[in-house]
């Protein structure tokens, strides 16, 4: 009887947490290749999770376009829960840059009334309207989400807060605070109401 020999594991498989450790330390340049190794060589479930982690590291590194492509690929290859996760993450990663129509197309598989991801997709679409300045539409959608008894309590509270915020005018400047005076020779400061870093 031949002796059983263990085949060597690929580098990424020996330390599958390396990518996560690097990402958590902020070293996205080294985290992405580590996730890619696991995604390439690990069994399917681990590979898909590594791809989602790789895309998350790309988002944090400011490489949203690349991340969205990975999220879309994961969604295209999965019909279960990972598909929903991937599409929601793709939606949030692109909500500020993608036209509303394209965002609707991206999230369409999740908006069916029987889909458990429908509330998360609705929140992204409402935020898209808010971000693009369609405040009345955003307020209406956030209120509908807040009133939806099937949504989670956390999501309903968050949607209710956004609906109330938008109903009261959001970040509109009512003139109660004078606009900042730009410094001599320097760039103008942001308008009143703009969040500061």
PLM segments and residue spans:
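Low-complexity, polar/amphipathic intrinsically disordered segments that mediate membrane, lipid-surface
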Residues: 187-188
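Short extracytoplasmic
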Residues: 11-52
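Soluble extracytoplasmic domains of inner/organellar membrane proteins
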Residues: 42-51, 56-184, 195-197
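Single-pass alpha-helical transmembrane signal-anchor segments
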Residues: 1-6
């Amino acid at each position: 009887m031949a002796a059983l020999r263990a085949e060597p594991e690929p580098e990424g498989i020996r330390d599958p947490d390396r990518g996560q450790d690097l990402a958590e330390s902020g070293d996205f340049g080294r985290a992405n290749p580590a996730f890619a190794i696991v995604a390439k060589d690990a069994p399917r479930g681990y590979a898909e999770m590594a791809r989602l982690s790789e895309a998350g590291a790309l988002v944090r590194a400011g490489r949203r376009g690349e991340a969205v492509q990975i999220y879309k690929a994961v969604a295209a290859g999965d019909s279960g829960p990972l598909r929903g996760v991937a599409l929601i993450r793709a939606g949030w990663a692109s909500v500020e840059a993608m036209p509303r129509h394209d965002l609707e197309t991206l999230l369409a598989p999740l908006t069916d009334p029987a889909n458990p991801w429908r509330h998360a997709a609705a929140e992204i679409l409402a935020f898209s309207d808010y971000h693009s300045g369609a405040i009345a539409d955003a307020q209406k959608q956030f209120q509908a989400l807040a009133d939806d008894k099937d949504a989670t309590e956390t999501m309903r509270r968050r949607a209710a807060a956004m609906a109330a915020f938008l109903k009261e005018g959001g970040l509109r400047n009512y003139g109660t605070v004078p606009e900042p005076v730009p410094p001599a020779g320097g760039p103008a400061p942001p308008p009143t109401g703009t969040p500061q870093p």
